[in-house]
Amino acid sequence: MVLLNRRKIQPKEIGQSADSFSETPWVIKESSERINDYDSDLKKLDFYKRDIFTCEISGKDGLSYFKALKSEEQHREKVRYLLPKELRKAIANFANFSPIRKVGHLVESAFQRFSNRFFIGDTVCLKTIQKNALITYKEGEPNLVESPTIENNVTLFLVKDVFQSNGMMESEKGEISAPKLSLYLITECLNRESKGAALIVGQNEIKRPESHFSKFIIACFLNEILIKVSNKEHAPWRVKQEYIERYDVNPKCSPNMIDYLPDRMNSSSSELYTPLTIPPESDVEPADWKETSETSETSETSLSKIKAIDDEISVSFDHIYDNVNSLAYNDLKGTVDDKELPFTGPSIPFENISYLDSSLEYKNIDQKWFKECSQFPTERLLVVYQFLSFFGRFIGLSHFNFDQFLTTIKCTSPEALVDEYVKINFLKTYNSKGSFTNEKPRNEIYNQVTSSNVSQREKANVFNADESQRIPSNFTRNQKMRKFITDKSTEFVMYSIFKGKPLKNDDMEFQSYEKVNILYIDIVCSLMCLMTDNEPDWNCNLMDNWTEEKRKEEGNKTEIDIAIEKCLNYGDTSWVKLLHNKNFSNGNWLICLLGILQQNTHMIAYSDVAKCITKKILPLSMNFVNLGDELWDNFRKRLSIKDKIDVLWVLVDFASNFSSYIKELVDKVPKLCNGIRLKLDSAKKEYIKLKRQLKTLTKNRVKLHSNVSMNRYGSDECKGKVNALKVKIAYLMEDIAFLEAKLIQSDIKRLEILGKDRNGNRYYWMDSNGSSSAISEKNEELYNCCFLWVQGPSEADINFCLDVDVESLKKWELLAKAKGTAYATKEVFSIFRSTDGSYYQIAQGENFMIINSNGILMRPTIPAFIDKKIISETPEKLLLSHHQWAFFNDIEDIHMLVDRLDDLRENEGQLKKALTSKMDRIEVSYKQQFKIKRRIECDETFKKNHKLLKNNEFTFPELKRIETTCTSNGQHFSNMEKISKKLSRTKNDLVLEAILKDVAHLGECERALLKKQQNLIYPLNFHFEQLRTIDLEFIVETKRKRQEDILTKLLNHQRYKHISHVSGYGISSQRVDKAAHLDVQGILEEIECQLISRRREDEERN
């Protein structure tokens, strides 16, 4: 209907129409009016032609009456053409009784809500620009006003079907909304008809053309269907009655909007505002919007009013829903089994996936991945750390992060204290005469050039006991620096890494390294303290039916039993007494550990581990001076990293299952968490209350500011109150963040499984990560294990999800352990990946392409479930065993994982929801860990050495010169060798005189060269290009020695820094003799005191 001055007008309102009995009426065919006289007709036409009208649909003004009518019809057609019916239903249901009052905000919200949600009949295009256009619009299509122009070379598709998961509840309206991610079946379209091939795409892979979906189109549609519930202030919008049945809109009003309904339900709606007739002063958001949760009681009058209105609505509109479902536009399908959804092609492989090898070093996934994982108890390591991270503070342990935990375990092995050194060798070159030459003698000339730059400590480690043979290093530490060094090798020069000389027990550095073991010893001692209480009784409730009968009688003891008994009663002191008195000094802790392991040998769960460790740490003979030192030496040298982790796991698992003290702590934790939650809820309620007051004061301040006649003092007073409320709200936000971090920190469930993906892989996250940094920036190093871990599927999941039998799985594991996962996958499942990324399947001795390098499926048959897993994870990174553990080393890969997870899948939907809810903390944790590690490893010393290395790099001319100088140098030393031989054989004086002259000449040359070397003593950062005369050989040799020195320091720097970082723990650690009890009331009071003190500090600072 045409508008004039924001008011709807009818033709009868402009002038009097002709009498129906008039014989010669004048007819205006555009408005179907009949006018009696010619003058009235001219006046009416003149009025219609004035440019004073507004189109009710588009809002365009300055039109004549007839142009406005035509504009309305054209825009109605445009809305129906561009917006499919399902999308119009969704928008209508969203806008009906929406809490958003301002029209512009409602249009913006609708655009944001549905810009990435697609419905059947939608016209879409792929986000990637296509080179060849399949479909374009032609000139013969409907010519609409401002008809959409389609970009050239863009293929259009029609949405034919939608695969959706369970809906999510909207907090504002309580209705089901579409999921964030869906799959769509689309087909190529021409003239609004589907043709060509069909594709299945994800929600993030398609978009609507900009000309098909815009805020203007949405505004036109809302202008057509919306009307105010009433003309009361801040009344909500509703859909007009004539559109309710058409778009399946629920006409029932929510209880929180009852006050805005008109007093009489059957009152005429012709006087109600529409989006274009509402006055500008009324088109505002309410400042005193009432939340439904603000009041806990509802008066009897309100309840009766709601019931009466519901009854009236039911009588008027219930017939609409007799044969249709409510919210039919969003009738979502339930979650489906992970096997039922179609295969969408290969995924982009994760680049930064790493694992822990048997030496506790971080490594990128390689060929030895499965072998390392199958021999290393990653799960036990994580279980031990999550136990210590929570209960450590109650058993006297200071906080330590995951990297410190790994370092202290590694340093209990002598191998971890061995340095590495770098050697640079110039390769043999093929000279012009066709013979090979070696430059080794030339190296020995310049051995003195940089020997003063090597420290005494490095001299001891650079050379092995046997000077003629170096031991290549097989360490896996510092992977980035190792790769950096080995990648510097070229056809002229080779960079090699060798093991240094092992440190002896009496070395000063060995004794300084012993400090790093204090953390491991403190952990073991603290766990052993949980076994007994102050009385000489066990503090663990061991159930009789969990033990086996004693296998050996007292009179039938073996040599091992006798040796164990002597160790447990060494020095006429029982190990039980040592444990009871907490006497762990001088190696007594190992005697107590040996006794606890012996007690556990009769428990099925721990018997194998206990027997293996006992056998390894027992002395070979009883001839020793100090039993504690002997046990410690055997513990360090004979036990592997796996054995040392198993020691901690036995103690942790035993205490978790049988310790009454741990049970007491676990029982008190829920009470503590509930107390923190009460404080948190109170703070949130206060925050909501202050926000409401702030809105009210802001509204009053605007009124005072707009009214000039008001007192200025009142405006200033209102401004002061607003600023005070803002300060209080800021304090409350800090308190809420503090309490949320405390709640996370107090929760026991650290290593929780987040969910499983479609292939059965399980994901873990220690939820306390980052909580310390959120509480106090001063203790930002108190992070835990900031990694998202993924574990391979169990045997049951492999059989159920992938349809792989046990025999094939066992065969794959054996081959993967021997030759890697890629080889095993090719042999067992007959699938391999080529260098260009294509996937092939071996059948009858021939290779058939499954997926090409562009990720397109080349075969009509759908791949099997195991084939889908291989293609999605790649054969090199295939997870097919519960022994395989890996972690995401980059936050970008985690974002890629979340985007890849499918809401429709039963398992992945839960996993995606869990990851999304924790994503903020995960991002903070990764960022924090990276920052701390970089600060530790990349300190000023590292930067200085890295800069010196750049100044001493080989240039290409220098490397090329090596090839031409090798021959002359070889001839020079060969001449000296020949002269020496002649001198030893000759007896002729004349010949001898000639030889001596040659020797003197060579001696002068040598002295001149040495003098030149002595004059050329330059600092490490000196640029050799500054020399006027350049001795290329000397420069090359000097650079080589300097590079060896610098690269050796850089290679060992990371390990030095981590060891020194953990060595400081022993100074601050103070293990208590008695475990502390969890005082819930005391902790809650302490939290309250911390809140008060933080508030005072902020006030003083401000």
Curated annotation (Swiss-Prot):
This is Putative ISWI chromatin-remodeling complex subunit YPL216W. The lineage of its organism: Eukaryota, Fungi, Dikarya, Ascomycota, Saccharomycotina. Residues 375-435 form the DDT domain. The keyword Repressor applies. SMART domains: DDT. It comes from the Eukaryota. May be required for the activity of an ISWI chromatin-remodeling complex. It is found in: Nucleus. It comes from Saccharomyces cerevisiae (strain ATCC 204508 / S288c). It holds the Pfam family DDT. Residues 271-301 are annotated as: Disordered.
